[in-house]
From Swiss-Prot:
Keyword Nucleotide-binding found: no
Main location: cytoplasm
Native source species: Synechococcus sp. (strain JA-2-3B'a(2-13))
Recorded GO CC terms: cytoplasm
GO terms assigned for molecular function: ferrochelatase activity; metal ion binding
Name this polypeptide is given: Ferrochelatase
Pathway participation: Porphyrin-containing compound metabolism; protoheme biosynthesis; protoheme from protoporphyrin-IX: step 1/1
Amino acid sequence: MSKSGVLLLNLGGPETQADVQPFLYNLFADPELIRLPFPFLQRAFAWAISTLRAEKSRRNYAAIGGGSPLRRITAEQARELQAHLVAEGYDVPVYVAMRYWHPLIESVVQQIKSDGITRLVVLPLYPQYSISTTGSSFKLLDRLWAEDPELACIERRQICSWYDQPQYVQAMARAIREQLDGFAEPEGVHVLFSAHGIPESYVTEAGDPYQREMEACVRLIWKQVGRPNDHTLSYQSRVGSVRWLQPYTERVILELGSRGVKQLLVVPISFVSEHIETLQEIDIEYRELAHRAGIADFRRVPALNADPLFIAGLAALVRPHLLTPGLAAPAFVPAAVGSSLLER
């Protein structure tokens, strides 16, 4: 019997203080995220850097309640998406898997196999594609499918990026307008789109489309916002000494303060769920930086989380790939090892 399922992918995050160091190890052990000239050093590097950064990272998580809310929020997104699909006649399970913390992709795909899924629609919760996020997860799925003949019989439909999905764009624009309208002088607010950064070499040497898609995404959203405010795109969360995509968010904040900007609205453009980068880096670090720079009114657009319009957009992304209710599945011949169907 044919059976569709949906798999939501995200980064993952530590839920307790004890989780922090092993989570960081998993993160830095991924060669798609941190590229070393000598791959055999990856694990030693991951152990060293996770050990060195663990204490500071624990303090950051303590500042937002002790751990990441990402798993809880992603589970809520999955429940709402499943309910939306059921209401449309698609009675399909929606699974959640994380790249670097529990529930890990490796364990969730075993559950998918046990549940008898024959077609799996994979939707990374990263609107813009990067080899370090969506690409890393797809590469892991390719390896798991190649190693397990039973998994290889499950058809995989993978959605690469969806920064231009209409309901996502509309939901972001609406959230920005709502926040702008709360300022004393809405027309004088500078809007700062802050995206998670990646090393510049990923774009210039590896051909990563992330920067191009991010810039296009901001243009689409801003057109929907329909306001005359000045706006800027910047990149946050830089790690290490290598050059990352610029301008850096912290430098833009300082520059805006020096130019006399007094009202600033930050839009976390690459984050669809609240987590450490929004709750601690933006809400605490960047807020303090802005106030020191003379920006009196600093606000942030909330992440979309389980916003109904956003969930409707996710449903629109996966719906074309689900088996039509009441109809038998079309014949499927497993693809060559490591291949997958990629959709835009």
